[in-house]
Amino acid sequence: MRDRFEEQALALGAAMQALGLVRELATAGRLDDAQAEPLMSSLVKPYEGDLDRLYGGPTALAPGLRRLVTQLTNPQSMESTRYLAGVMHLEKKLSKNRAMLGQLGEGLEAARRQADYFHPLHENVLRNLGALYGETISQLGPRIMVRGDPGHLQDERIAAGIRTMLLAAIRAASLWRECGGGKLTLILRRQRLVQAAHALLERVD
């Protein structure tokens, strides 16, 4: 069985990978399919207690794990810190809202069927998941204010991708909490998480 800190690092790495894609979409208007695929998998596949199976292991989340190490050891972007704090705050609020969790679950089930018909990164799937985020988590507040190129942010397709990646980050934060993560973990066990992330990266193919 994987070390619990490695489980936490894997989930946090997924969150950081999703937030990195939020920034890329907002500033450059593009989505890296290879990085997005494991994150979409976490939204359209049921979680059966195995993060490796859900995400595809450390190799699929290597970019996010590297971002996590940087964030925990030498944070260079206050934007990343703000996004991550916002995601964790919204996930905590969501966890206490049973009605919204039910609505979100129904929406994700519909997305699973759609992804089976098309594929997880199909434009229709991204659009519907983005709409689901807007109808649920965005209503919790406070909203995560994404900065970027105004032209990209006003593009409906790109905006849907941003919301979908935020949803994937919320999903990862939920899994991190299920693995025992919390605010004190980031404060008191920061170095242990860094070591766990390094250990995972050493196994990258």
UniProtKB/Swiss-Prot annotation:
Q: Where in the cell?
A: Cytoplasm; Cell inner membrane
Question: What range does the record give for the signal peptide?
Answer: none
Q: Which GO terms describe its cellular component?
A: cytoplasm; plasma membrane
Q: Does the keyword Coiled coil apply?
A: no
InterPro entries, per this entry?
HflD, HflD-like_sf
> What NCBIfam families does the database record attribute to this sequence?
PRK00218.1-2
Q: Which family does it belong to?
A: Belongs to the HflD family.
**Name of protein:** High frequency lysogenization protein HflD homolog
Q: Which organism is it from?
A: Alkalilimnicola ehrlichii (strain ATCC BAA-1101 / DSM 17681 / MLHE-1)
